[in-house]
């Protein structure tokens, strides 16, 4: 069935269609290209039409990260709009993050007015000449699944429905739609559209049965099977399927470079966060949604190990170079493929063998977790604060209704995440500044949950904190921000030491890595009405965390803890 609504412009029809297609938020960093859209919003507000809710985000980095954070929690794409090509340039790092993380997103930007006169949206500012580009889509084309320019009111429904369908199809990712001001500003009286989009969205697929059986034979025949995963938990439904598979095999599951809760940490078969100790023995390795299961330059699977890869795109076809071998590659939705594999393995491994393996993994896990806790508690008096102790203190206050967004510094070995969808780490694409906006998006997606954002001081600066704290206050999205302040870009420092272990930089100092003297980050949060504390005494850290969580939950106000950590 179709629906017919009275409108005044293409912009109004566009907002009507986004709302009808389930877009709840438009995260926006506005410019002169927004004029028709803002006028359309004003009319919709006056007539009681609130969706998609516009969120003003005063910097493109948190704007894109907010859409990313909302989608990673809910699985539902949201819309972002930035100011023509200059806004898209500022947003590109976030788009790369979304692309590599497989996050659906309708990314849009205004299109500089094409005409110099004669139309309602024609050029009337100096920037409208200087901002014109020959091919605006070229800026981000490599990192979006599809890009297009809306050229005519009559194609609005087709274009938007196709954009959303392409974004949601696996492997998911952002799409880019440019919106010329003249087209948005065109006057129209009526917009008619289908109640339900008919753009094809492919159903989730499962790998071919014969390929699943071959993979099952490889795993069942192994004496030391191993599972490595990075992002199986992107689909929470894949987690119980992975648990069933691991239990059928009695195989350890390693969260290598993990970005999600992929496997409950309290399960006896959780194998920790480093696959290296297992690779020498493993004669079959199941790699699940992992672009980089190990570093070939440092440690690889045995040459004779049989390798099975499971992912929506097991070849990671958008990566120019990726040379990880596979005997069987199983494309499709991991929850379906893993469930099929678990069913094929049922009874294939004797129960006594699986139980013996399970006990061996469990014993190693108990020892590993005990050692991690002992290490953290032994460092609990150190000042400046050790990150292991900070991570342990955070782990002690977590519950299933708390979501953690981690941009690098939280040590997961000091925590115990068991519920899918409660932990998200920065994409390995490394577009810094992701954490602040992603945490805000997560809070909008799950308003009944507590959201904690763990972020390094360098990443905090990249995240446009003035903008992020303002958004938190303006839209009542309280987050507990924890800055792991070690006053250095440690990833850069580690890279230098890896490149030249005994070189000049180690002996004489490292330019381009220092963040000393540190700003008083707590003042940035306070400027937007938040509570903030600098924490220097490790013995006062648990009380500071308890105080912070009470304020976030009871007062619904953001809190920042600037934790002074050891400088490496």
Locate each region found by the language model.
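Thiamine diphosphate
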Residues: 116-131, 279, 322, 329-331, ...
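Conserved short loop/turn motifs at secondary-structure junctions
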Residues: 230-235, 378-379, 456-458
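Charged, low-complexity, helix-prone segments enriched in Lys/Glu/Asp/Gln
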Residues: 70, 112, 353-379, 442-443, ...
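N-terminal alpha/beta PP-like core and its mobile active-site loop of ThDP/TPP-dependent enzymes
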Residues: 2-345, 349, 397, 469, ...
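Phosphate/pyrophosphate-binding active-site segments
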Residues: 1-5, 154, 304-408, 520, ...
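Serine-centered coil/turn micro-motif
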Residues: 266-267, 402, 486
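Active-site diphosphate/adenylate-binding microenvironment
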Residues: 11-22, 32-42, 362-448
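A glycine-rich phosphate-binding loop feature that marks nucleotide/adenosyl-phosphate handling sites
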Residues: 178-183, 409-411, 564-566
